[in-house]
């Protein structure tokens, strides 16, 4: 992730070298949990709005404008900079107005092409369902920001848009990406999303970008150990092939009879880099340093260390560890007041002993 934080948050340093707003949500979640309040965040958000003034969609993709709203609210909760929301007031509220005009009374949208991630792109019905859930999620966060900005009329508009969207029933069509977003947005019970979609086949059907939201859906259903097993299998599969950075795309099937990236390809084996990839990144065009795949880093801070932000700027946090089969976990969590130091150890009776040191200004609640 750090390699892609060069003044701006790029995805990725090898090829695109562009500020992709959708890619940025796993990235800013990771940056916030590892590096803290980082200037590249503000530079990237400002640049995106300058490059794509309303009524244009950010990066030419309406989904990435939805991610803009989600990212803004998420970062506000982490670091509490209301003045930055004020700086972006016109863009945030203008985007609410633009989206409102695109949603009809039956919950259908006229926002152009729908996109989640590349591996899902051939499942049109599933992508439509996931995009619909992304719209609901974005409107929920836009409503919260409208209230923070003192604009009750816009907040009401967000509620009305969400109500219209909820009138339409969508089908994930077997797509894990869609079911995960539907669980997060409250359009599907997390237990159903995991039982019928996300958990089916374990890591099969996971993707580097949307795998983060699949892990989040599993956590919502209390399936922490299962999520950690999938991290070990899927992202661990990259490590087994010699990865030292997050890859743009990955399929466990690629590892069959493939050589590692840190050695010459043995005769008779596949080149894990040159022989795979897909869509716009076949072969050596495939990026092996892509921040959108970093979701497990953020996920482990939130669910293994167990840090939940309850009040903007980390003024109040709850810490609830989920160790799975781990015997211990240790780490830090950045806040505007300094780092929270955390260590969890499993006792012989299975209970967990926690040692937590929080800076002044951060209240840890049970």
Q: What does each of the following model-derived ranges do?
A:
Residues 160, 228-366:
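Non-catalytic C-terminal accessory modules of carbohydrate-active enzymes
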Residues 51-67, 99-163, 171-216:
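The feature captures the catalytic groove of carbohydrate-active enzymes
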Residues 1-102, 106-107, 111-117:
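Substrate-binding groove/exosite segments of carbohydrate-active enzymes
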Residues 202-241:
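Repeat-solenoid scaffold signature
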Residues 26, 67, 71-74, 87, ...:
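Alpha-solenoid helical repeat scaffolds
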Residues 20, 37, 41, 61-68, ...:
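Active-site-proximal structural scaffolding
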Residues 32-45, 76-96, 143-166, 170, ...:
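Structural helix-adjacent loops and short alpha-helical linkers that scaffold large soluble proteins
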Residues 14-26, 51, 63-71, 75, ...:
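Carbohydrate-binding/catalytic loop surfaces
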């Amino acid at each position: 992730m750090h390699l892609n934080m060069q003044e701006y948050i790029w995805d990725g340093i090898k090829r695109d070298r562009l500020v992709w707003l959708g890619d940025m949500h796993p990235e800013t979640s990771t940056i916030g949990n590892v590096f803290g309040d980082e200037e590249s965040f503000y530079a990237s958000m400002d640049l995106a709005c300058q490059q794509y003034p309303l009524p244009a969609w950010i990066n030419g993709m309406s989904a990435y404008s939805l991610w803009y709203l989600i990212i803004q609210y998420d970062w506000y909760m982490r670091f509490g900079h209301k003045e930055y929301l004020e700086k972006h007031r016109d863009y945030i509220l203008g985007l609410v107005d633009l989206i409102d005009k695109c949603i009809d009374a039956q919950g259908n949208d006229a926002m152009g092409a729908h996109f989640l991630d590349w591996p899902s792109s051939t499942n049109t019905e599933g992508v439509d369902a996931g995009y619909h859930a992304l719209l609901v999620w974005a409107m929920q966060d836009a409503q919260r920001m409208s209230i923070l900005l003192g604009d009750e009329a816009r907040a009401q508009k967000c509620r009305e848009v969400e109500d219209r969207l909820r009138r339409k029933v969508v089908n994930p069509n077997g797509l894990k990406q869609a079911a995960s977003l539907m669980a997060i947005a409250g359009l599907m019970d997390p237990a159903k999303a995991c039982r019928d979609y996300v958990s089916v086949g374990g890591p099969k059907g996971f993707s580097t970008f949307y795998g983060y939201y699949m892990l989040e859906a599993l956590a919502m259903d209390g399936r922490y150990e299962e999520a950690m097993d999938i991290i070990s299998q899927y992202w661990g599969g990259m490590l087994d092939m010699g990865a030292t950075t997050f890859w743009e795309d990955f399929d466990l099937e690629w590892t069959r009879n493939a050589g590692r990236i840190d050695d010459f390809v043995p005769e008779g084996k596949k080149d894990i880099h040159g022989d795979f990839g897909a869509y716009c990144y076949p072969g050596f065009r495939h990026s092996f340093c892509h921040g959108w795949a970093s979701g497990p880093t953020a996920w482990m801070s939130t669910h293994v260390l167990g840090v939940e932000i309850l009040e903007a700027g980390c003024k109040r946090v709850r810490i609830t560890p989920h160790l799975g089969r781990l015997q211990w976990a240790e780490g830090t969590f950045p806040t505007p007041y300094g780092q929270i130091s955390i260590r969890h150890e499993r006792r012989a009776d299975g209970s967990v002993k926690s040692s937590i040191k929080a800076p002044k200004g951060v209240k840890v609640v049970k």
